């Protein structure tokens, strides 16, 4: 079986991910659900703030463009699992992200960087396992 190496440049970048209808709908549905549950705002605005902050931190620490881009994508997509349920949203979000990024033709290596960060982002159940998830 051949695997994509993830060495070549990504076909889609953070800005294109932000324009993706499926991802946007998942974020907004999650925001609606959380609003009904009494949580603070978790809209695309929140997602973009997390993404930009993640990118800024990795840039300040001297990471390369690819790693920064993946951190921004993970930050933007980190709460898509709320569209299913707040409970275990990090894990369901990682599964959703895997399928979406696979359909968008991301390399398996890049998919795993993003899904690992999403799956480990919940403050109650997650832990930093690499520079992107941190």
Whereabouts are the PLM-identified features?
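Acidic/His-rich, divalent-metal-binding segments that scaffold phosphate/diphosphate chemistry
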Residues: 3-90, 102-103
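Histidine/acidic-rich helix-loop-helix segments that form or flank divalent-metal centers
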Residues: 107-134
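Metal-dependent catalytic cores of enzymes that make or break cyclic nucleotides
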Residues: 85-95, 106, 127-128
């Amino acid at each position: 079986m051949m695997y994509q190496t993830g060495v070549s440049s990504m076909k889609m970048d953070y800005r294109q991910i932000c324009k993706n209808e499926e991802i946007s709908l998942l974020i907004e549905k999650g925001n609606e659900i959380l609003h009904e549950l009494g949580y603070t705002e978790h809209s695309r605005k929140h997602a973009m703030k997390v993404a930009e902050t993640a990118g800024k931190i990795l840039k300040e620490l001297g990471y390369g463009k690819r790693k920064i881009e993946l951190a921004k994508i993970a930050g933007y997509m980190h709460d898509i699992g709320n569209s299913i349920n707040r409970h275990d949203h990090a894990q369901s979000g990682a599964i959703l992200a895997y399928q979406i990024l696979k359909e968008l033709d991301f390399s398996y290596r890049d998919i795993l960087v993003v899904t690992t960060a999403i799956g480990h982002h919940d403050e109650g159940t997650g832990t930093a396992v690499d520079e992107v998830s941190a």
